[in-house]
Amino acid sequence: MKVILKEDFINLGREGDTVEVRDGFARNYLLPKGFAVFSNKHNVEIFNQKRRSILKKQETKKQIANDLKSKLDLVKLEFFMKSNDSGKLFHSINSLNIAEELFKLGFDIERKKIDIHHGTLKTFGTYDVTIKLYEGISSIIKVEIKKEEKQEDKKPLNKKLNKVDEQAERERV
């Protein structure tokens, strides 16, 4: 079945493109959700008239994606995770965790645009994560998973710091 897309679809086409899809996909998903319309003479004429505005909109999206790429290339995310004694993480990092951290930094990135090559990150280390922004435009951010120090480890360190502070205080007086 031929349909005309009303918005961009990854691996399918861009807004205004006439594409051939399976009947069930068109009837059960694209048409009811308003993502596409039937490709008939009337709809083709309407989209031909809108072609300039569609091209201008695509150029704007491309420019926004390039600006976002330049900002995202500077981002490095750090996650502090708990692990067992052998170093295995209790919780893995997935695209949702990365999307939430990016949102905290002011980037509104959809989860489906984040591509973790291994699916989830399950061990300590530094990883490259690809974010697909627009056709052919993607950004690679660094994601580092570090070990969260246990409370027991922090207490002696704080006591040592307090002793150093007390000695410095005595020397001032």
UniProtKB/Swiss-Prot annotation:
InterPro entries: Ribosomal_bL9, Ribosomal_bL9/RNase_H1_N, Ribosomal_bL9_bac/chp, Ribosomal_bL9_C, Ribosomal_bL9_C_sf, Ribosomal_bL9_N, Ribosomal_bL9_N_sf
Gene3D superfamilies xrefs: Ribosomal protein L9, C-terminal domain, Ribosomal protein L9, N-terminal domain
Alphabetical UniProt keywords: Ribonucleoprotein, Ribosomal protein, RNA-binding, rRNA-binding
Function recorded in the entry: Binds to the 23S rRNA.
PANTHER family assigned to the protein according to its UniProt record, in alphabetical order: 50S RIBOSOMAL PROTEIN L9
NCBIfam families listed in its UniProt record: L9
Protein name from the UniProt record: Large ribosomal subunit protein bL9
Native source species: Borreliella afzelii (strain PKo) (Borrelia afzelii)
Phylogenetic classification of the source organism: Bacteria, Pseudomonadati, Spirochaetota, Spirochaetia, Spirochaetales
